[in-house]
Amino acid sequence: MNQRNASMTVIGAGSYGTALAITLARNGHEVVLWGHDPEHIATLERDRCNAAFLPDVPFPDTLHLESDLATALAASRNILVVVPSHVFGEVLRQIKPLMRPDARLVWATKGLEAETGRLLQDVAREALGDQIPLAVISGPTFAKELAAGLPTAISLASTDQTFADDLQQLLHCGKSFRVYSNPDFIGVQLGGAVKNVIAIGAGMSDGIGFGANARTALITRGLAEMSRLGAALGADPATFMGMAGLGDLVLTCTDNQSRNRRFGMMLGQGMDVQSAQEKIGQVVEGYRNTKEVRELAHRFGVEMPITEEIYQVLYCGKNAREAALTLLGRARKDERSSH
């Protein structure tokens, strides 16, 4: 591979970053995958697979491993960031001075900025300036299924139409990976943050033993909370009926591959927050997202009762069953009301 002709540099060699890199490489593109731990990258290069997360998926020959950040960023103008939301801003500030003058950046990170609750687009603009084209991909994607080449569909939104078209062409694979463009940059970002919160709630409900009826009601009312918050931020309500909204919400709330759902189930079964996090063993994005989404809702005056009760369980020591009963005991109202 010529040092500067890769189609994409992927920043983040966890399960999802690796799965996206494999998908791009399988599409016939030269891809560079960078990770912050040189030993981990050396292991990936030696094994030609990510044995920790995706042990049965060999790397295509066009997937190249790199532990030097400057070299990785020089390889392509297109940069795909796949890191946890709480380090997103830090990573962008780290890569900014090393990016090519013609760089364009897309992220698959789901969530909001830690502590502030800001959308990641605002974090990116602050870190990178106003000139770099930005994009986000989001939707119902478990890394194992994506890497295995099972059929998957996502949404893509960008600040730049040319970048959006190029990304859609790079990512789209008629055999297994369908990419829908969407002009709603805010909505595509927001869905991925709120669904993490609701998935914890769905897990709690199942952990308590409330059954399928309760889980479905929670998903439906969670979608209403997502839509209300989106409307307050200027998103298109139709976005939340698509891949980045309802699609991701249903997947994360109903399948045990979801760390957020499994975390919630443990809480519903009586485990404390710290023990549940330790048992999961990987980042539970919804834990931080709950605090961030709640802050965003308060800032915009949006009532989100499910999010509030999950926050009370995670940060204030409330019992999961008690939180569920609080929701069930709320005053009667019109299903279409704004609160």
Curated annotation (Swiss-Prot):
Pfam families: NAD_Gly3P_dh_C, NAD_Gly3P_dh_N. InterPro entries: 6-PGluconate_DH-like_C_sf (IPR008927), 6PGD_dom2 (IPR013328), G3P_DH_NAD-dep (IPR006168), G3P_DH_NAD-dep_C (IPR006109), G3P_DH_NAD-dep_N (IPR011128), NAD(P)-bd_dom_sf (IPR036291). Its main location: cytoplasm. GO terms for cellular component: cytosol. GO terms for biological process: carbohydrate metabolic process; glycerol-3-phosphate biosynthetic process; glycerol-3-phosphate catabolic process; glycerol-3-phosphate metabolic process; glycerophospholipid biosynthetic process. The active site is at residue 195. Is allosterically inhibited by G3P, the product of the reaction. NCBIfam families: PRK00094.1-1, PRK00094.1-2, PRK00094.1-4. Belongs to the NAD-dependent glycerol-3-phosphate dehydrogenase family. PANTHER family: GLYCEROL-3-PHOSPHATE DEHYDROGENASE, GLYCEROL-3-PHOSPHATE DEHYDROGENASE [NAD(+)] 2, CHLOROPLASTIC. Homodimer. Catalyzes the reduction of the glycolytic intermediate dihydroxyacetone phosphate (DHAP) to sn-glycerol 3-phosphate (G3P), the key precursor for phospholipid synthesis. Is able to use both NADPH and NADH with similar efficiency. Can also catalyze the reverse reaction in vitro. This is Glycerol-3-phosphate dehydrogenase [NAD(P)+].
